[in-house]
């Protein structure tokens, strides 16, 4: 064979001994633009999203909105490196290249300028599915970085989404209700 492997033109069906012809078609993986923070410590954010999507056969395209030394949930005040200037340039570059995204996914957006990046991505790729994880709080409390203005911007972003993925606390914040954990706990006790 001269060192070249030959592609099989048929698939053997187990337990039957029959071969069925098949065609091999190159398939370009789906591209997901992941607009999220990158936390150096904390098992969250882009550090978790990127490998999960890759294993699923999806091509994740990272757009870090901010690089944090740790996540913002109780580990003190993290060191921060804002990614908005980079994000603007990256979006323009992808658009100039003619990159098409099948999906745009947003996670933690720690400021209004970061929400603006997501809004711009939604406008540049209107046909992409839009998934918003409105990361704003947990366990009945909003994160310390969440302001009323940020909540309003994230609420508006959710209105443009095809799918939103709030946890219980975030759903309460979006609905302008006081987040609480007691109601959920009482409901679970009576199941």
Stretch-by-stretch model annotation:
Residues 18-79:
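Glycine-rich phosphate/adenosyl-contacting loop at the front of the ribokinase-like
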Residues 7, 11-12, 23:
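Leucine-biased recognition of intrinsically disordered, low-complexity hydrophobic segments
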Residues 98-103:
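Short acidic/histidine-rich motifs immediately flanking catalytic phosphotransfer sites
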Residues 106-186:
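Conserved beta-alpha-beta core of the PfkB/ribokinase-like small-molecule kinase fold
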Residues 189-191:
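Conserved small/polar residues in nucleotide/adenosyl-binding loops
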Residues 78-94:
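Glycine-rich, highly charged phosphate/nucleotide-binding loops
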